[in-house]
């Protein structure tokens, strides 16, 4: 009886650790990418670029952009760190540099009036609109978003972690990117009503709060990269 009770406690504890690791990786990925991707801010640009299309065509484009954005972010997160390492750049250095970039992006979002990955995109006008260019890149996923994804992908535990821990973090990161893709689709799908509901002040508040979280994540990534760098043999 007592043995079965302890076994149940161990199973519950293991399950909670698994959920905590997945939730932590999910929150890190989503909170790091959302302020830069910021589909709520990009939604009016999307609506302006697709204003000549029917509602059905606009919805189809929103779905394609979400899928393309998911593929770009996932590719940057998975392959980006190893491509840099292939060129002889150590991953801890990549983490430090990426952390500086993330912190700088967060600071710009927090202090400047008009700065984002969508800078320079026209709010209206007519141009040939494609699901990849310009709607996916650079309107939705630009260089800032991709650099954040690479930095998050390079954030690894020192040493050789167990396979279960790797699987949990990969699952959480994947869910985070899926959540970003869903926010892209929903923001673009309801772009015509979102700006009217939130208003300029609502979008401003959301961006500033997200920017502060992004700065904290950037500083934490810098510290992890520095800790890993000084631990390497010279």
Per-region residue spans from a language model:
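Short, strongly hydrophobic alpha-helical membrane anchors
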Residues: 2-24, 158, 228-234
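Transmembrane helix exit motif
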Residues: 100-122, 217-228
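A small-residue-rich subset of transmembrane alpha-helices
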Residues: 55-81, 156-195
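Membrane helix-loop-helix hairpins that form the core translocation module of multi-pass transporters
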Residues: 59-113
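Structural signature of hydrophobic alpha-helical transmembrane segments
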Residues: 25-42, 91-101, 172-184
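Juxtamembrane transmembrane-helix termini in multi-pass membrane transport proteins
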Residues: 25-77
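Small-residue-enriched transmembrane helix starts and helix-helix packing motifs
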Residues: 10-35, 112, 119-136
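Transmembrane-helix boundary and interhelical-loop signature of multi-pass inner-membrane proteins
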Residues: 54-55, 75-97, 183-226
């Amino acid at each position: 009886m007592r043995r079965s009770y302890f076994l149940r406690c161990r199973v519950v504890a293991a399950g909670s650790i698994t959920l905590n690791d997945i939730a932590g990786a999910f929150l890190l990925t989503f909170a790091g990418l959302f302020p830069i991707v910021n589909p709520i801010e990009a939604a009016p640009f999307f609506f302006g670029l697709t204003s000549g299309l029917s509602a059905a065509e606009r919805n189809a484009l929103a779905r394609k952009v979400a899928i393309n954005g998911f593929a770009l972010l996932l590719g940057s997160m998975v392959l980006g760190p190893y491509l840099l390492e292939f060129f002889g750049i150590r991953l801890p250095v990549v983490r430090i540099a990426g952390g500086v970039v993330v912190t700088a992006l967060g600071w710009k979002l927090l202090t400047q009036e008009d700065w984002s990955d969508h800078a320079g995109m026209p709010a209206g006008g007519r141009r040939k609109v494609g699901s990849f260019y310009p709607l996916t890149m650079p309107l939705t996923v630009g260089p800032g978003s991709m650099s954040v994804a690479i930095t998050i992908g390079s954030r690894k535990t020192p040493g050789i972690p167990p396979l279960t821990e790797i699987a949990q973090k990969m699952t959480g990161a994947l869910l985070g990117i899926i959540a970003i893709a869903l926010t892209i689709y929903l923001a673009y799908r309801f772009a015509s009503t979102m700006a009217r509901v939130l208003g300029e002040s609502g979008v401003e508040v959301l961006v500033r709060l997200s920017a502060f979280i992004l700065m904290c994540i950037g500083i934490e990534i810098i510290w992890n990269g520095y800790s890993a760098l000084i631990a390497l043999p010279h």
